């Protein structure tokens, strides 16, 4: 859920970028525990493919390999979905998020969540709803405070394959009643300061995962009427918060550790990433200005169910940030920093084009958090690009039979920013949506490499635009063989919006998605009630084989009042 504030500070272009940012340390406001290959090393020499225009890297034909295998697909949350807790009733945008474990799949859509079966040791089928649709804040039932009481959307789910745990991150967008002492908003360049704890009595009481009864028609009608009540005035001086829930094992129906961190600034659009030393959660933040929070939560203590810290860097004049999210099981070199990236350009100053991707290195010191470091930004030169539709919240993608166009979120690197280590090779895969020479929209994708000195450089790049249709709002993954898979929305004047998948086999010619397109779901209707389309979506690599890539996205059914979602699993090449 994205918003522009009523007042803006115009953002400077990233080329003019900033000195090292200072750090905000936040103690957990509340916390409790609920009941209940071999390594393939590529020998191809790394070289820069950075120079040239956008057209130089544009792929104008489909790949000649066969498409990725669609192993299974099923209906997720959205219009027409019915599960143990009743029928889906959602709001736009969907804010799709997906996580895959060994025996379960969790999906969150805006303010709702569901748990599905995954064929394996426990279940003999995939895609059967075990839980949901329920409000995402049910994970925090019994915890108390705003994490339990509020449910405004933008919740994101991850599976931490290194520990076999689930992670749910949920922001609170409403200011809370003022406390006796409130944390002061931090500004870029100010000295580090440890923030207050939200509840001196933490950890709170332990409760099992709450499983509600299906709502009655009367309760559903009451919920619909509440949506139409104007929002009450915001209390002056109160803070927001970020809520974390980490399961104590691989069964999502088991117990969870829950945490609340006080945020003095609005915590929009969280994008969690798993890294050995923390859960990295950047947000777009601020109330009357646009800043970025680059935050990290203390993963090891969360996994042990202990009180934990969250530290935040405040960054001015940057695009939407993403931290690298670890795919697979091979760890990065011990103690190496996480890397965070953003596109260039500045929509607020009408700068929609750039020829660089910008990155920072984040080094966390949990023993002495004030010594944590944020280094950067540094520019990686890439082929020129222009934001698809000139950025976010713009009417961009046409649809059949209507003048309503869809938003493309063209100003940002999309979730996830993927990290994969294979032997001594360390890769980062990123995607964003760009204009194309054919007049539609394309998926610009990159594979970066990290050398032994921790320098980041471009290895290959391309813009997938095989025709004049629109391909946008993508999400990438890399499997254990180094194959790259990308799911994305597909549509245009002649095609209702739906979801497709493509990719490439490791070692294929650089800059080309060599696979044909796999259809996940064909759109059946145009979305006419809003321009908002998903805001983001998500891939997930299956931890069971580290090869299968899962993806989720929106589409509309014939006669539907609102979006539906489709979840699918793809495999590139043959399992070895």
Model-derived features: positions:
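C-terminal PAP-associated
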Residues: 20-197, 201-204, 208-576
């Amino acid at each position: 859920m994205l918003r522009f504030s009523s007042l803006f500070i115009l953002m400077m272009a990233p080329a003019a970028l900033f000195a090292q940012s200072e750090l905000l340390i936040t103690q957990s406001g509340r916390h409790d525990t609920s009941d209940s290959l071999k390594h393939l090393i590529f020998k191809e020499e790394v070289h820069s493919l950075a120079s040239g225009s956008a057209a130089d890297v544009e792929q104008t034909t489909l790949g000649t390999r066969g498409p990725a295998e669609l192993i299974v697909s099923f209906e997720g949350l959205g219009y027409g979905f019915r599960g143990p807790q009743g029928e889906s009733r959602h709001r736009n945008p969907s804010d799709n998020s997906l996580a895959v474990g060994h025996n379960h799949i969790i999906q969150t859509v805006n303010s709702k969540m569901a748990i599905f079966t995954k064929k394996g040791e426990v279940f003999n089928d995939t895609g059967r709803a075990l839980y949901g649709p329920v409000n995402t804040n049910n994970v925090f039932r019994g915890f108390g405070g705003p994490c339990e009481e509020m449910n405004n959307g933008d919740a994101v789910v991850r599976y931490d394959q290194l520990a076999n745990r689930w992670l749910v991150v949920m922001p609170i967008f409403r200011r809370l009643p003022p406390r006796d002492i409130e944390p002061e908003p931090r500004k870029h360049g100010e000295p580090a300061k440890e923030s207050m704890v939200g509840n001196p009595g933490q950890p709170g009481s332990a409760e099992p995962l709450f499983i509600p009864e299906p709502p009655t028609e009367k309760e559903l009608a009451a919920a619909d009427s509440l949506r139409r009540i104007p929002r009450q005035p915001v209390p002056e001086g109160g803070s927001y918060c970020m809520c974390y829930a980490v399961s104590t094992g691989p069964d999502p129906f088991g117990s969870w550790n829950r945490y609340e961190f006080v945020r003095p600034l609005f915590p929009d659009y969280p994008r969690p990433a798993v890294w050995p030393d923390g859960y990295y959660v950047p947000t777009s933040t601020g109330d009357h200005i646009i800043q970025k929070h680059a935050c990290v939560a203390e993963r090891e203590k969360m996994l042990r169910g202990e009180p934990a810290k969250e530290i935040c860097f405040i960054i001015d004049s940057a695009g939407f940030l993403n931290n690298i999210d670890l795919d697979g099981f091979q760890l990065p070199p011990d103690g190496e920093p996480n890397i965070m990236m953003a596109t260039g350009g500045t929509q607020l100053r009408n700068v929609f084009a750039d020829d660089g991707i910008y990155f920072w290195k984040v080094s966390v010191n949990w023993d002495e958090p004030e010594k944590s470091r944020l280094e950067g930004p540094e520019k990686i030169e890439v082929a020129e690009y222009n934001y698809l539709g000139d950025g976010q919240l713009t009417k961009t993608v046409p649809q059949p039979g209507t003048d309503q166009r869809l938003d493309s979120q063209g100003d940002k690197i999309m979730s996830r920013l993927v990290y994969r280590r294979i032997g001594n090779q360390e890769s980062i895969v990123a995607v964003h949506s760009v204009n194309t020479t054919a007049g539609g929209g394309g998926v610009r994708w990159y594979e970066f490499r990290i050398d032994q000195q921790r320098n980041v450089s471009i290895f290959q790049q391309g813009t997938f635009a095989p025709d004049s249709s629109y391909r946008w709002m993508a999400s990438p993954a890399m499997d254990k063989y180094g194959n790259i898979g990308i799911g994305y929305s597909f549509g245009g004047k002649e095609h209702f919006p739906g979801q497709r998948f493509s990719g490439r086999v490791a070692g294929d010619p650089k800059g080309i998605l060599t696979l044909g397109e796999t259809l996940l779901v064909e759109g059946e209707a145009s979305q006419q009630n809003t321009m908002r389309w998903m805001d983001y979506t998500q891939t997930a690599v299956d931890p069971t084989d580290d090869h299968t890539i899962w993806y989720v996205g929106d589409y509309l059914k014939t006669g539907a009042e609102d979006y539906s979602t489709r979840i699918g699993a793809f495999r590139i090449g043959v399992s070895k």
